[in-house]
Amino acid sequence: MAWELIQISSGHKSLENFKLEADNIPAVLHQLKDHFQGRLETGNKIGVEILSSLAAEILIDGIKLTVGWDNWSGLFILAWDADGDNLVQEIEKFINA
């Protein structure tokens, strides 16, 4: 998988893979669950906008991330704060290994 770590307009980190589609989200969530095991929890929000975006909130060590897909970024893992930035960087190290 060709994951790219970028800084988005909010100043936070996002891992993006333009080659993956929305139907790859379950496989990525499974990969995250395998890696983080008991540290990963599901969040409260899941959203779908037909044909243009899909997203799910997850928590790892209580830190909120969004795993989603849209027609601009492809599949992404998005941070919401500085703790999330560090976590996205941790994910990038194992997901690109």
Where is each model-derived feature located?
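Amphipathic, interaction-prone secondary-structure segments
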Residues: 42-66
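Short, compact, well-ordered microdomains
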Residues: 57-97
